[in-house]
Amino acid sequence: MNPNNKSVLARVFLPLFFCVFAGVSSAQDIPWADSAEEVGMSTERLERINAAMQRHIEAGTIQGAVTAVARRGKLVHFETHGLMSVPNNRAMQDDSLFIMMSSTKPVLGVAAMMLVEEGLIRPTDPISKWFPEFAEMQVAVLAPVDEDISPIRVNPLNVPPHRLVPAAREITIHDILTHTSGLASGGLGTVLSAASIGGLDNRESLAKNVPEYGNVILDFQPGSRWQYSAATALDVIARIIEIESGIPFDEFVKERIFEPLGMNDTFWNVPEEYRGRLIEVVGADTAPPARAVLYDTSHSTYFSGSYGLKSTAGDYLRFEQMLVNGGELFGNRLLSPRTVRMMSSNQTKDLFSNNVEGQGFGYTVATSENPIVAKQRRTQGAFGWGGALGTRSWSDPEEELTAVIMIQQPVPQVQRDFENAVQQAIID
């Protein structure tokens, strides 16, 4: 197939508020099973992953992919598919670097849980403990309707009649980690606060920007709704981690997460010698200013907890394997099993399922509460997240399974087909 003759139907929707070493590490560092059957999977059925990816490549929906699966601590599948550069007809590599977008968020979640374990923060802590600007926030509501709720989607050129009311309570770390804070989640308050949230500028810093977010008008009363904050709220937690640890967020994550897990190919800023391994993204029609920031690979000083990482399938599989192991990998314990369970348990009651039936939401990850209702091919209790360009991963404690798919066109059907192919390959 000549991919140049195929259209890649990728579209990336960016909300108004979306602001913004050496050595090759791969999944082979997780030991290979002697056979898939050794860990209760079918070699023949795992081939269906390859068939599914090839089908989508030939259809022109994706340019390529890297897929990886491990069970019971052993690797059973690690394959490259298609092209990392369509114009240059360059084959995908097992160490290709992908733009992770919101797959950055679970890394922030683990970092936050580390501080919870150390007693430096608590989920119930108000954000005003660190930033007084967050003490007396306001909520945008419709007027004259007497209810404290605002529409989630607002045309910034035609803002409806509205009024501001005091927040019923302060927002907390729990609210931000679960996307129930109302901070910069794309509603009326976000539109009214565009100037406070700021533009896309990755030359700023968490220290400068985060206090200004206290001036943002909330989209709803804290704790009353689940609505995704794609690029702002979790940065507040990243800045708190900086304050409590005494080091920049990127250094904390590198020292406390990446280095213990051997994630040597995961960066906000990709070293020059590795930039040839970056996927050349095809089909994303992001506006030029946003694209310049989100795809920047070497010059950022704003180390977001929401987006910005670049990584490989092998590195991210290690991260997921650590979680499915209950917080430990290669003899290095990052979290206790109980803390991982807290992070991966539904913390939002039915607020998330009102948006996505059959699922719950923990601390930065979605949880499978009823896979049938959720139209998932996962086990109840599995958890994970993904990024806007198509990266997706999950950990399944019951099946002792981790799976990662790296693509750079956000095509949900590709993710579903991968998930189905993984699940049907389990034979005990």
Predicted regions and their residues:
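Boundary at the C-terminal end of the N-terminal hydrophobic targeting segment
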Residues: S25-A27
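Short, conserved catalytic-motif segment at the N-terminal edge
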Residues: I30-M100, L120-R122, M137-A143, Q424
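Active-site SXXK
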Residues: E47-Q54, T67, G73-L75, F98-I127, ...
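Short, surface-exposed loop or secondary-structure junction motifs
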Residues: P126-Q380
